Each structure stands twice: as C-alpha cells, then as structure tokens.
Curated annotation (Swiss-Prot):
It is an enzyme of class 2 (transferase). This is Ribosomal RNA small subunit methyltransferase G. The lineage of its organism: Bacteria, Bacillati, Cyanobacteriota, Cyanophyceae, Acaryochloridales. Its main location: cytoplasm. GO terms for molecular function: rRNA (guanine-N7-)-methyltransferase activity. It comes from Acaryochloris marina (strain MBIC 11017). S-adenosyl-L-methionine binds at residues 96, 101, 119-121, 147-148, 166.
Length: 256
C-alpha cells in the first residue's frame, strides 16, 4: 500500500491546461487517492499508487482530455483545432470506467455536469458509489452493463453530449462503443498512448460508418514522466445506423 499525500502541482495545472483546481477540489483529489489506495488490494483497481504517478497518470491524464472544456481558450493552448460550447452543462458517459477514471476527476471539477460511470463489474461500481458518497458528489450515477447493450437502449442511445473512453481497446472498437451513445454534435474523447498513421486510417474508416468524424488528434507531453499521450476527438454528425453497436463482444472480435 502506498503512503503519503499527492504532490501540489498547481503550477503544472496552470501551465499545461490553463486551469487550476480550487482548494476544495484539491481536497477531493486527495481523498479520492486515499480511498483508491485503501481499496486497491481487494479490488485491483490500479497498479499506480505512488503519489506523483497517481497525480500524473490518473488525475492529470483524466483531465487533459477535456482541456477544450476547461477554459474558452484552452483549445488553442492544447493545439486542438475546434471550439466547444461553454454555455451549458454536459451529460457525460465514462465507458469502461474501472477505478473511476477519467469520470471521477471530471465529476469533481465539473459539478454541474452529469456523469455516468459505465462498467461491467458490479463490485467496482459498488465501491465507486461509496466514493461518490464520501466525496459528496451529487452529479454521478453508475451503470453496470456493456457499452454494446447500452448503445441499443433508450434512454441511453444518442443521449450524451460527451463520451470519454480510456484503456478499453483498439480505437475503432472504442468508436463503436461511444458514437451510438452520443447525441448529434456530441463529442467522444479517446485517450491513447502512442498513435500511428495506420491506427488513424482505421479509425477514420470506422467512424464514418458510425455517423461520426475525426476532428482532432492532440499529442500531449506528460508533465512528470515526459511520455507522450494522444487525445483523439470525434464528433457525431449524423444518426448512427441502428445495427451499431453490434452484439456484445462482436466489436472487439471483428473491428470495423
């Protein structure tokens, strides 16, 4: 079990995202860290429990994907060539949330947004419900299901403004999970490590079949480890064909 507190990285938040958490949000981040570490031995939530690594790979990494929504000018700061509407709260789904990332950090800093944490493991979701109560988060709900099922169900299908998906599978598979859940003009953020031209070609082809388009690929340097991450942004531009998503397991076995 890891000991110690999260590092204070207020300067890094500001330099990298043009944004800083409030003192209350910093306290919620710290409490989230402690709760994850305490439960980790029983639930196997994450291999990352060292405080600096947790800050970078779970907190900073979760929020870098929504940089365009943090500040009106952050799309310029993050070299993302599109602008978003900051005038209304968003309805968000975190697909395959696991230990609650990126959904919980997003819920902490965006209390007016409605966040749905989707996962197929009820034990993890039961823990996340306890975390929500402990952190006083009233804008989070959990859903135990598979994205392939949820994407075919009302009221979930084509109802979300934003889908975030991290460490779930190949990009084209993530697109099939996410795009059917998005309302028209909704966005999906795919959190990736390395990114290749071949992956991009496959994603563009899959996205076009699902009613979406690839609008930006944003490479970002991690502030502590100096590794490169990529945030892939998709936009829903037309209604998804009713045959998508396909049955549970099919997208992963037979990617578009």
């Amino acid at each position: 079990m890891s000991n110690g507190a999260l590092p204070n990285r207020s300067d890094v938040w500001l330099q990298s995202l043009g944004w800083q958490p409030t003192p209350e949000q910093e306290q919620q981040f710290e409490r989230l860290f402690q709760l994850i570490v305490q439960a980790n031995q029983q639930l196997n939530l994450t291999r990352i429990t060292d405080p600096p690594d947790f800050w970078e790979k779970h907190l900073w990494d979760s929020l870098v994907g929504i940089a365009p929504w943090l500040q009106p000018d952050s799309s310029i700061q993050r070299q993302v060539s599109f602008s978003v509407d900051h005038s209304h709260p968003l309805k968000v789904i975190d697909i395959g949330t696991g230990g609650g990332f990126p959904g919980l950090p997003i819920a902490i800093i965006k209390p007016t947004w409605r966040i749905t944490l989707l996962d197929s493991t009820q034990k993890k979701l039961a823990f996340l419900q306890q975390v929500n109560a402990e952190l006083g988060l009233e804008n989070v709900e959990t859903c135990c299901d598979r994205a392939e099922n949820l994407g075919q169900q009302s009221p979930y299908r084509e109802s979300f403004d934003l889908a975030v998906i991290r460490a779930v599978g190949p990009a084209s598979v993530c697109a099939e999970y996410a795009l059917p859940l998005l309302a028209l003009q909704g966005y999906a953020v795919l959190y990736r490590g390395q990114w290749t031209a071949e992956e991009q070609e496959g994603l563009v082809a899959a996205t076009s079949k699902l009613g979406g388009e690839l609008i930006a690929v944003s490479p970002v340097k991690m502030p502590h480890s100096q590794g490169i991450r990529h945030c892939i942004y998709l936009r829903k531009i037309k209604t998804t064909d009713p045959k998508f998503p396909r049955r549970v397991g099919v997208p992963a076995r037979k990617p578009l």
